[in-house]
């Protein structure tokens, strides 16, 4: 999960989930992360905040591996750059790109896993269950074959 926090000129904070497929955050250079900002709730609070105050914060959490990373920096909106949007657009992702956000890193920290509940994506659980079911079916077939041989 990825969250982007911003604040307006008066310091009023705002945090918003930023969705996209795995790998949609792209490293541009050692100090810059870029990503396509997809059409969403149409409130444009993040865009308004960044127009007034470029300070921003990324909070990344991986529930499966119980890891989190906090990234401080500044962000800016890039609109109308078709080449940059195409470079950052995840392959085969069908959401509508609205703009690009470029995030310049000033500091980051990886936290300990304490108190992070472990959670799994439904697709990963389905895959593990399918593998288990396949193994059970093979074992049941082997047992049936052994019983017939007695």
Give the label of every model feature segment.
Residues 1-150:
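Binding-site signature for planar aromatic cofactors or substrates
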């Amino acid at each position: 999960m990825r969250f982007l926090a911003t604040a307006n000129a008066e310091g009023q904070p705002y945090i918003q989930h930023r969705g996209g497929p795995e790998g949609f955050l792209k490293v541009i250079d050692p100090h810059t992360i870029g990503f396509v900002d997809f059409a969403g709730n149409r409130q444009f609070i993040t865009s308004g905040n960044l127009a007034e105050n470029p300070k921003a914060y990324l909070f990344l959490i991986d529930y499966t591996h119980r890891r989190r990373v906090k990234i401080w920096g500044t962000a800016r909106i890039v609109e109308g750059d078709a080449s940059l949007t195409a470079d950052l657009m995840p392959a085969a992702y069908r959401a509508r790109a609205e703009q690009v956000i470029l995030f310049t890193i000033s500091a980051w920290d990886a936290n300990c896993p304490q108190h992070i509940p472990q959670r799994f994506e439904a697709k990963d659980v389905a895959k593990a269950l399918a593998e288990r079911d396949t193994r059970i079916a093979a074992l049941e077939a082997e047992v049936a074959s052994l019983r017939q041989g007695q």
